[in-house]
């Protein structure tokens, strides 16, 4: 990238006026547009990231030209790829490869001045005439800045650079108008709290509280995508706290604010919500690098940490002596997790994995009191399957006791169990464990046709294999016949 001294508008904070790196491809595109007497400006996230000294991998531009006018220019520039899925919104995209093999992707949109239907967040697309008018329809001032190319004039009509320097999220126009036009902007606000560590300006925050119910018109997929981006950020806790405080969570993840009403059974935390936030942070800290078993950021682990205790409100019971219990909250929580993630249209594989982690998150606790037999360890690994590494991290993250002795006992037990698993894996491949007699042999030995009894017999023999390890085939056959005589012939 090339380094330039930008020409700043008067409203730009002195704290952010310095040298910035600009993609040479942006300058080149600007010259191509200028030759045809069209305006072109880098806008939104790439400009914000430039001021934060972050690298943007995709470049967004807006222009005075209509799509049919700038399409030939873009096709000529982006000789390695072109797409027009956003044509009806005035957007075309292109890609080119550099000599080093890296790709530069750009999307260019005609200036917009949209009209919104109050019953939908989808605007009636109308083209605008000025860059400033286009910037006024953007979500927040920190995203309503532009850099004209090729002359590198910085355009900031709403004080976005100043807000960026202060770490504040504010809308370019009245926040109620902005959120009424596009309610998803409220979700984007809390997502930026997580991604950028910003705070929401008071008037903007008040508008979110008042208008959270407008999110009801937003599709589940859009809500899911914002939640995902927030959870995969560096500071998801800040975003989740803003989600709850603003009332948005009540509309999109009601199980989370419900945790604020529940007192932790050990009275270690202000409420279960606080405990959940701590578990999430601890789980993130246990993620690995890209070469490890749980590469960061891991959406499955983070969702499981967020949802692992949502069954507590429905299972709360007041015991003698003022104690509170939440028996079977793991099972209840797993059912609630599946229902919520399905409502948000998450991928079914992810739903299965997160649900199973919530279901199993208490499984290890019995080991602390009394170490398991080898068969119990095998069963733990077999039952957790491909989620074994994630389950161990969720289990460790969930151990938030402030009692130093208990904490050390738990960590020692977890370390011991993991070492035992390593030793047992040297003896056999847990993922390949099967009964010593398969389904076909079961039917042959017991003279059965395919049916439920064959399935029950297979499950029994798998349990027997887990409990006893590998045994001689004759012993396995004897066990099968014994089980059949005692269970099915009574």
What residues fall within each predicted segment?
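Catalytic cores of the polymerase beta-like nucleotidyltransferase superfamily
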Residues: 1-490
């Amino acid at each position: 990238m090339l380094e330039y001294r930008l020409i700043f508008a008067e409203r730009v904070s002195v704290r952010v006026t310095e040298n910035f790196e600009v993609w040479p491809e942006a300058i080149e595109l600007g010259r191509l547009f200028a030759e045809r007497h069209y305006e072109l400006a880098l806008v939104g996230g790439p400009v914000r990231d430039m001021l934060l000294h972050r690298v943007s991998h995709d470049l967004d531009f807006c222009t005075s030209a209509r799509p049919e006018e700038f399409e030939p220019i873009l096709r000529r520039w982006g000789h390695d790829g072109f797409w027009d899925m956003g044509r009806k919104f005035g957007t075309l995209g292109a890609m080119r490869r550099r000599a080093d093999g890296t790709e530069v992707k750009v999307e260019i949109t005609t200036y917009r001045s949209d009209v919104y239907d109050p019953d939908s967040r989808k605007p009636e697309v109308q083209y605008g005439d000025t860059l400033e008018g286009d910037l006024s329809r953007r979500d927040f001032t920190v995203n309503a800045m532009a850099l004209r190319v090729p002359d590198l004039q910085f355009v900031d009509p709403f004080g976005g650079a100043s807000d960026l320097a202060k770490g504040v999220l504010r809308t370019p126009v009245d926040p109620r108008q902005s959120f009424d036009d596009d309610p998803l902007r409220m979700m984007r606000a809390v997502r930026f709290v997580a991604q950028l560590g910003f705070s929401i300006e008071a008037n903007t925050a008040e508008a979110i509280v008042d208008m959270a119910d407008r999110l009801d018109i937003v599709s589940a997929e859009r809500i899911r995508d914002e939640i995902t981006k927030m959870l995969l950020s560096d500071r998801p806790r800040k975003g989740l706290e803003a989600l709850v405080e603003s009332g948005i969570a009540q509309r999109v993840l009601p199980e989370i604010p419900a945790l604020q009403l529940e007192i932790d059974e050990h009275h270690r935390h202000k409420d279960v919500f606080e405990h959940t936030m701590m578990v999430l942070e601890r789980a993130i800290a246990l993620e690995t690098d890209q070469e490890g078993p749980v590469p960061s950021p891991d959406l499955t682990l983070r969702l499981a940490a967020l949802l692992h205790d949502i069954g507590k409100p429905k299972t709360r019971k007041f015991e003698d002596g003022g104690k509170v219990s939440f028996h079977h909250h793991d099972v209840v929580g797993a059912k609630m997790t599946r229902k919520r993630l399905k409502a948000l249209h998450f991928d079914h594989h992810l739903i299965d994995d997160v649900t199973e982690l919530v279901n199993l998150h208490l499984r290890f606790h019995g080991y602390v009191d009394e170490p398991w037999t080898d068969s119990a360890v095998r069963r733990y690994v077999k039952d957790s399957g491909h989620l074994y590494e994630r389950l161990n991290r969720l289990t460790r993250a969930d151990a938030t006791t402030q009692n130093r002795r208990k904490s050390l006992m738990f960590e020692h037990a977890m370390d011991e169990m993991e070492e035992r698993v390593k030793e047992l894996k040297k003896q056999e491949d847990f993922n390949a464990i099967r009964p010593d007699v398969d389904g076909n042999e079961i039917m042959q030995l017991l003279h059965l046709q395919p049916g439920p009894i064959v399935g029950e017999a297979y499950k029994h023999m798998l349990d027997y294999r887990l409990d006893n390890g590998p045994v001689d085939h004759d012993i396995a056959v004897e066990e099968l016949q014994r089980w059949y005589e005692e269970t099915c012939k009574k």
